[in-house]
Amino acid sequence: MREQMHVRIVPMTGDHLDEVAELERICFTTPWSRNMLVEELQNDCAAFLVALDDEDHVAGYAGLLVVLDEGYITNVAVRPECRRNGIAQKLLQVFLDFAQAHKLAFLTLEVRASNYGAI
């Protein structure tokens, strides 16, 4: 079994916006713009995490929107060269722990049927 890449999971800040916006453009056909990310960072009902590599570059990120007692994972993206290292799993585990601690009724993530890596 291949050794997993070491990352630190931390809350996303304004310092991460450029790298996250670039990651959006790389990973999605309809990416969120930098301005959309700024707006979501300012949303009190949203939380965003980044996975930082050993050089403090963004290897991946994920977003969560909480509405009443419901959790909606809005985004999960990992740099192509960093995939298959458990990064998305680590990001999602933080949200799962949050959902359990705050007794959310559910936590959802929509994935395209063609996204076999996510399924």
Spans of model-derived segments:
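Acetyl-CoA-dependent GNAT
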Residues: 2-4, 8-83, 89-98, 102
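Conserved hydrophobic beta-strand within the GNAT/NAT acetyltransferase core sheet
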Residues: 73, 106-111
